[in-house]
């Protein structure tokens, strides 16, 4: 259970320190199998347990340990999870933390695509993007985690319908440490690599699985960091439907669309009207969840439409 992973905080800390010392300071010690920690029953799918089971902060503890030791993976779908698990089980002398929900989720990538994406750890999803080589993106929508990825994709689908000429780039992150500078972590990106993905000056709306300030912490030295706007879990929740919980934390598709509109004043009056429409959709879906205890079919059974 993700929420109860803090029970082993101290054990994780001691093992990570021991691994660091044995790997970097003791030449005669043989490699050992990595410690692989799978966090499931995640924060975003607590339809029955509620607030007490909503705690994604283990990642904040893990990321503080030696960059030679810790790895954090948040695969967006089942094939990416398989690729990640395969990699972690074959590794030695690491602590690999994998965050994956146990509920059913959409499948975005075939196995070959998943292996390539997970090997890179981060990448642009061309099929979900509307920018191309001729036009720079107007905005970057980024995601990290299974539920946040679904909501971010749903937001992009709405933007494509409402603003057909808007150039949106979609970036998905599997390996969280890829966001760190290359000089701080062996998996980190150089500034050139980071800007190639996120641009150097366009607004970024980032939907994250955990506490949003962790992304700000990892990216604070990047070019124009103030343009990176992060959504994530903000200690708002109860026994909620999946969409209702994301709405409470403003990590849902409708709030993400509003975030994009607020950062693109050029959308003008059309943006203002769409913003009001999104607010109405939020109210409608909260009322439905409260009355019926489930999300609308169009939400629960949503599929990528393009």
Q: Language-model features: where?
A:
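Long, structured ligand/cofactor-binding scaffold of large enzymes
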Residues: 1-23
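Short catalytic-loop micro-motif centered on adjacent basic/acidic residues
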Residues: 71-74, 141
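Thiamine diphosphate
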Residues: 24-35, 39-60, 67, 84, ...
């Amino acid at each position: 259970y993700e929420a109860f992973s803090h029970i082993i905080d101290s054990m994780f800390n001691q093992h990570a320190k021991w691994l660091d010392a044995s790997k970097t300071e003791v030449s005669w010690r043989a490699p050992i199998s990595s410690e692989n920690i799978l966090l499931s029953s995640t924060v975003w799918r607590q339809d029955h347990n509620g607030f007490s089971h909503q705690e994604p902060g283990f990642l904040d503890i893990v990321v503080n340990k030696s960059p030679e030791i810790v790895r954090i993976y948040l695969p967006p779908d089942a094939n990416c999870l398989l690729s990640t698990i395969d990699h972690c089980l074959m590794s030695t002398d690491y602590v690999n933390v994998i965050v994956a929900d146990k509920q059913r989720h959409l499948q975005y990538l075939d196995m070959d695509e998943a292996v390539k994406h997970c090997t890179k750890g981060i990448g642009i999803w061309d099929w979900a993007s509307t920018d191309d080589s001729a036009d720079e993106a107007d905005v970057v929508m980024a995601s990290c985690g299974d539920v946040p990825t679904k909501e971010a994709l749903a937001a992009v689908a709405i933007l494509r319908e409402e603003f057909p000429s808007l150039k949106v780039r979609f970036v998905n992150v599997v390996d969280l440490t890829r966001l760190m500078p290359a000089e701080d972590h062996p998996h980190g990106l150089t500034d050139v690599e980071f800007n190639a993905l996120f641009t150097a000056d366009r607004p970024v709306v980032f939907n994250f699985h955990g506490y949003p300030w962790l992304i700000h912490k990892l990216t604070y030295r990047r070019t124009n960091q103030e343009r990176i706007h992060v959504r994530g879990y903000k200690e708002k929740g109860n026994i909620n439907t999946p969409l209702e919980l994301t709405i409470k934390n403003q990590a849902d598709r409708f709030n993400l669309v509003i975030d994009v509109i607020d950062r693109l004043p050029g959308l003008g009056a059309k943006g203002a009207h769409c913003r009001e429409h999104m607010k109405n959709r939020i109210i409608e879906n909260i009322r439905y969840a409260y009355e019926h205890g489930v999300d609308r079919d169009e939400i629960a059974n949503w599929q990528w439409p393009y």
